C-alpha cells in the first residue's frame, strides 16, 4: 500500500503542512502563469469555465495565507498575493456581470448555485476565520505548539513496528546541492537490532524527525569515505550519545581507513563532549559514551564477504563493489527471518553486487542519469564554470545508470528496486519518468524513486513489502 502522505511526498506536496500547498504552486509555476493568462482572457468571455480559475485562485490564495500563518513564509505573500487577488476580483466581477446580463434561464440557474444566501454566508464565515487566525495568531500558535509537543512526545511509530526487516530512507541525495534531499543515509531495523548505513550531511536531523531511537543504534555501517557518506558522522555520534544516555561509544564499521575517520570525528567533537558532560552531568552525558569506536573490515577480493554482525535470526554481510579510485567500497546485505535487503553503496555495475543481491526482497541502488548530467556539463561549459564541467564529466565513470541498475535487479531476481543517491538532483516528480530512462524495459518489478521519510516494511516469514511514512 502507499499512504497518502507517501504519494504526496513523491509529488513534493505535503498535505499535512501548509508549505505543501505552496510547493505545488512552486513546482508547477508555468501552470500558474498559464492560469493568469487564462484569467485575463476569461474575464472578457461569458463562459461557465470562468469558475474554474476562480476556484483555483481561491485555493492558491488560501494556501499562501495558510503558509504564512503556519510556516512563517512572508516572502511568498506580498507581490504574488496582490496579483492573485487582483485576478480573483476580476474573475468574480466578470462572473457577476455574466450573471446579470445572462438571458438564458439555464445560465441563470447555473450561476445562482454560486451566488445565493448560503454561499455568501459560507464565504463570509471563511473570511472571518481567516481574519481571526491573523488577529489571534499568538494564542492559536501557543495552542498548536502545546498540542504538537504532546502528540510528538507520545508518538513512537518505530516501537509499534511488527517483527521483520524495516528499511527507512533518511537521506537520498548526493553531493550536488538539492533543495529536496539531504546526504545519503539509510536505517535498517531487524527485530530489536538497529543499524544506520552511511551518514550523509543533514541525515541525522532526518533520523530524529523520523523518530529513530538513536541511542539504540547497534552500529553505523559505512560504505566508503566520500564526504557525502560520512559528513554527519560526528553529529550522529553526538546525538546517539546525548539523546540515548549511552555509556558506550557508537560502534562504527567500515572498510580499511575507518579508524582514521572515526578518530578525526572524535577529535573534532572532543571539546563539545566535555562541555556536554560539564553542563548535563553523567546522567545525560556520561563521558564513557562519547564519540565512536571503529571496526575495520579488510576484504581482499570480490569473491570474499565478511559477516559484520550475526545472531540467531540476523546476518549482516559486507562485500566489495567497484567505486574506483576508492580503494575499498562496500555494499551490505541484511538477512532476517526469511527477508532480505541489499544496499549497493556507490558503485559501477558490479558482478559482486549482482551475486550478493540474488533473490533479495529489496534492492536499494545508487543511480546516475547520464543524459541529465551531461546537460549540466554542457551548461557549465557554456557559462565558463570549468570546475563544475570537469566534475560532472569525471563522475560519469564510477556510478550506475538507471538501466544498468534495472538489469542488475533483473539478473539478481530482486523483488523491488529502490533508487536513492540521485545524481543529478530530481527536483520535481514530473522528471521521474525521464530520470528512469528505459529502466522498466529491463526490470518488470516495482521501481521506486526514494524520498526521505519512506519506510519499507518486510514482515518476518512473509512475501509482503509494505510502504509507510515516518516524516511528520
Residue ranges and their predicted role:
Residues 73-84:
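Non-cytosolic membrane-interface motifs at loop->transmembrane helix junctions
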Residues 56-66:
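Aromatic-anchored segments of alpha-helical transmembrane domains
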Residues 107-133, 331, 340-342, 348-452:
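Cap/insert and terminal regions of metallo-dependent hydrolase folds
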Residues 1-18:
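Hydrophobic transmembrane helix segments
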Residues 46-56:
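Membrane-interfacial loop-to-transmembrane alpha-helix junctions, especially the N-terminal start
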Residues 19-40, 55:
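Core segments of alpha-helical transmembrane spans in multipass integral membrane proteins
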Residues 103-341, 430-463, 471:
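Binuclear metal-dependent hydrolase catalytic cores
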Residues 87-104:
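Membrane-water interface at the C-terminal end of transmembrane alpha helices
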Amino acid at each position: 500500500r502507499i499512504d497518502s502522505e507517501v504519494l504526496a511526498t513523491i509529488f513534493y506536496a505535503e498535505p499535512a503542512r501548509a508549505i505543501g500547498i505552496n510547493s505545488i504552486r512552486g513546482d508547477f509555476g508555468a501552470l500558474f502563469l498559464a492560469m493568469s493568462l487564462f484569467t485575463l482572457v476569461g474575464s472578457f468571455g461569458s463562459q461557465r469555465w470562468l469558475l474554474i480559475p476562480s476556484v483555483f485562485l481561491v485555493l492558491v490564495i488560501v494556501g499562501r495565507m495558510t503558509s504564512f500563518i503556519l510556516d512563517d513564509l512572508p516572502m511568498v505573500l506580498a507581490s504574488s498575493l496582490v496579483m492573485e487577488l487582483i485576478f480573483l476580483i476580476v474573475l468574480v466581477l466578470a462572473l457577476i456581470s455574466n450573471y446579470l446580463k445572462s438571458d438564458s434561464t439555464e445560465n441563470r440557474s447555473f450561476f445562482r448555485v454560486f451566488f445565493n444566501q448560503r454561499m455568501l454566508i459560507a464565504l463570509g464565515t471563511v473570511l472571518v476565520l481567516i481574519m481571526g487566525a491573523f488577529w489571534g495568531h499568538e494564542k492559536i500558535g501557543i495552542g498548536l505548539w502545546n498540542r504538537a509537543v504532546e502528540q510528538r512526545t507520545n508518538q513512537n511509530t518505530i516501537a509499534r513496528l511488527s517483527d521483520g526487516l524495516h528499511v527507512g530512507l533518511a537521506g537520498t541525495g548526493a553531493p550536488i546541492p538539492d533543495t529536496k534531499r539531504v546526504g545519503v543515509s539509510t536505517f535498517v531495523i531487524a527485530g530489536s537490532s538497529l543499524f544506520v548505513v552511511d551518514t550523509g550531511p543533514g541525515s541525522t536531523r532526518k533520523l530524529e524527525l523520523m523518530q529513530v531511537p538513536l541511542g539504540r543504534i547497534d552500529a553505523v555501517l559505512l560504505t566508503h569515505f566520500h564526504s557525502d557518506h560520512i559528513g554527519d558522522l560526528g553529529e550522529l555520534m553526538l546525538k546517539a550519545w546525548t539523546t540515548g544516555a549511552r555509556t558506550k561509544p557508537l560502534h562504527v564499521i567500515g572498510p580499511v581507513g575507518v579508524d582514521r575517520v572515526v578518530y578525526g570525528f572524535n577529535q573534532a567533537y572532543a571539546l563539545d563532549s566535555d562541555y556536554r558532560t560539564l553542563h548535563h552531568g553523567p546522567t545525560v552525558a556520561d563521558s564513557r559514551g562519547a564519540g565512536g569506536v571503529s571496526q575495520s573490515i579488510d576484504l581482499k577480493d570480490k569473491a570474499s564477504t565478511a559477516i559484520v554482525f550475526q545472531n540467531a535470526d540476523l546476518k549482516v554481510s559486507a562485500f566489495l563493489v567497484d567505486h574506483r579510485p576508492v580503494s575499498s567500497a562496500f555494499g551490505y546485505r541484511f538477512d532476517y527471518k526469511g527477508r532480505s535487503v541489499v544496499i549497493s553503496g556507490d558503485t559501477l555495475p558490479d558482478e559482486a553486487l549482482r551475486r550478493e543481491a540474488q533473490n533479495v526482497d529489496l534492492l536499494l541502488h545508487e543511480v546516475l542519469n547520464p543524459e541529465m548530467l551531461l546537460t549540466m556539463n554542457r551548461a557549465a561549459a557554456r557559462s565558463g564554470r570549468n570546475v563544475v564541467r570537469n566534475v560532472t564529466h569525471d563522475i560519469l565513470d564510477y556510478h550506475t545508470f538507471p538501466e544498468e541498475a534495472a538489469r542488475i535487479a533483473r539478473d539478481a531476481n530482486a523483488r523491488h528496486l529502490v533508487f536513492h543517491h540521485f545524481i543529478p538532483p530530481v527536483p520535481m516528480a514530473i522528471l521521474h519518468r525521464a530520470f528512469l530512462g528505459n529502466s522498466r524495459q529491463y526490470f518488470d518489478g516495482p521501481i521506486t524513486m526514494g524520498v526521505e521519510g519512506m519506510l519499507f516494511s518486510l514482515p518476518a516469514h512473509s512475501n509482503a513489502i509494505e510502504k509507510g511514512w515516518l516524516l511528520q
